Amino acid sequence: MNEEKWDDAIAAYKKAIEIDPSFVQVIFNIGITLNSKAISLKDQLANKSTGRLSAADNQKVVDVLNESKGYLEKLKEMDPNQEKTNWAYPLYQIYYALGDEAKANEMQQLLKK
């Protein structure tokens, strides 16, 4: 999916939570879509021969991951027992990608339950 499609989906989800801010599935979808956008962006921006990102391109990916993290952390507060959504694994992926080992380990423990 190209960046424009990710952004269209995210905008639609954000409109939905303006109507119902407690709709956990939509909040989950925003977090997942942003996470997918970050992965796609990383693949798109990576140097084709080395697979590495420039500092500026890396920051673009980090910014999207941080936005995704915000939605998933909000969801963690709203649905702490993961009764409506399984937020632990995508949040683990984000913490891992951002290098937050302590929080990644915390999520990994939740995944073992």
Indicate where each model-derived feature is located.
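Short coil/turn linking the two alpha-helices of tandem helical-hairpin repeats
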Residues: 1-3, 31, 36-47, 97-100
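Structural marker of alpha-solenoid helical repeat scaffolds
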Residues: 19, 78-80, 113
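Residue-level recognition of tetratricopeptide repeat
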Residues: 23, 82-84
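Short coil/linker segments at helix-helix boundaries
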Residues: 36-74
